[in-house]
């Protein structure tokens, strides 16, 4: 029998992994992020097919899987990084499947000779998993020619190239500084196969995220409160330091506090379950954003 006649069962292989479950969960748990989700699906498909090819003795260089996540604050970069490590583990691409989040200070030392051991220590801990470098652009300080950041980048580059079967590196940060960072470090940029951009959420998406967050904590918006929250989000979006889903999360924490306060002030009443669950419009409208 020629080797071309050998076959594998895609469905069987697919079922062996938990990948379908993870992709579905990803879809359900994360609102919006359509381009991000489709890239993840593509990566998962590539890895699965690669595995099948290997089973049949068709070899291909293992695809580089280093990634770049760019986007505004609170758009889900860290959250997706965690899911990504799950997926890569399920597909057998990484052996341990943990995610280690670091920033510049974990990699770069203050004094001469301190950076290399620091960076190597971090890389050792991350082996078999995902190294998530948050605010990666801080690694490179062009104004300071004695900066030890470039030493860390050198070591990182070598490992990204030579040990790509054992480690996936994700560089994350806000779009503009990351673009500048890559311009100054083309070697790094070109070793990253997947540049994924996280779009800002629309008001509708943020409302949907709010409802999911509340549901998780067994709270509910009244119809009026939902109107108020929609107005709140539209206003908050235009203010400085807006951080997408994180701003919404913080706003909901404050609304819960106001709800508790409101109920507390009405002491003496017998409380119903509904009253304890409901967030009312006034719990939202008391925000200073409406002043
Ligand atoms: N699409 C989404 N659906 C539901 N919840 C989300 C979504 N995106 C983000 N969140 C929630 O919003 C919060 C902030 O997300 P996350 O920390 O992943 O953002 P980030 O992009 O890493 O932000 P930063 O750039 O500031 O580090 C988390 O609590 C996360 O669960
Ligand atoms: Mg983050």
UniProtKB/Swiss-Prot annotation:
InterPro entries: AAA+_ATPase, AAA_lid_6, ATPase_AAA_core, CbxX/CfqX_mono, CbxX/CfxQ, CbxX/CfxQ_RuBisCO_ESX, P-loop_NTPase
Binding-site positions, ATP: 71-78
Molecular function GO terms recorded: ATP binding; ATP hydrolysis activity
Pfam families given in the database record: AAA, AAA_lid_6
Family affiliation: Belongs to the CbxX/CfxQ family.
Function recorded in the entry: Necessary for the expression of RuBisCO.
Protein name per the record: Protein CfxQ homolog
């Amino acid at each position: 029998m020629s080797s071309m006649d050998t076959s594998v069962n895609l469905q069987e292989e697919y079922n062996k992994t938990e990948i379908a479950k993870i992709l579905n969960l990803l879809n359900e748990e994360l609102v919006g992020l359509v381009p991000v989700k489709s890239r993840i699906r593509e990566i998962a498909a590539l890895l699965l097919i690669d595995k099948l090819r290997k089973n049949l003795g068709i070899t291909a260089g293992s695809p580089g899987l280093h990634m770049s996540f760019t986007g505004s604050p609170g758009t889900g970069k860290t959250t997706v990084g965690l899911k990504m490590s799950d997926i890569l583990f399920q597909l057998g691409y990484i052996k341990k499947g943990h995610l280690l989040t670091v920033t510049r200070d974990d990699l770069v030392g203050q004094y001469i000779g301190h950076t290399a051991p620091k960076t190597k220590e971090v890389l050792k801990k991350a082996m078999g998993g995902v190294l998530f470098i948050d605010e990666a652009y801080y690694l490179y300080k062009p104004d300071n020619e004695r900066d030890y950041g470039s030493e860390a980048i050198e070591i990182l580059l070598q490992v990204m190239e030579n040990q790509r079967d054992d480690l996936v590196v994700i560089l994350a940060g806000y779009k503009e500084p990351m673009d500048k960072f890559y311009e100054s470090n083309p070697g790094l940029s070109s070793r990253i196969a997947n540049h994924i951009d996280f779009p800002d959420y629309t008001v509708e998406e943020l409302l949907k995220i709010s409802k999911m967050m509340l549901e998780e904590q067994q709270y509910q918006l009244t119809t009026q409160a939902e109107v108020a929250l929609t107005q709140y989000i539209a206003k908050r979006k235009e203010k400085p330091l807006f951080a997408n889903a994180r701003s919404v999360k913080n706003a909901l924490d404050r609304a819960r506090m106001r709800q508790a306060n409101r109920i507390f002030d009405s002491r003496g009443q017998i409380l119903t379950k509904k009253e304890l669950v409901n967030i009312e419009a006034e719990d939202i409208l008391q925000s200073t954003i409406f002043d």
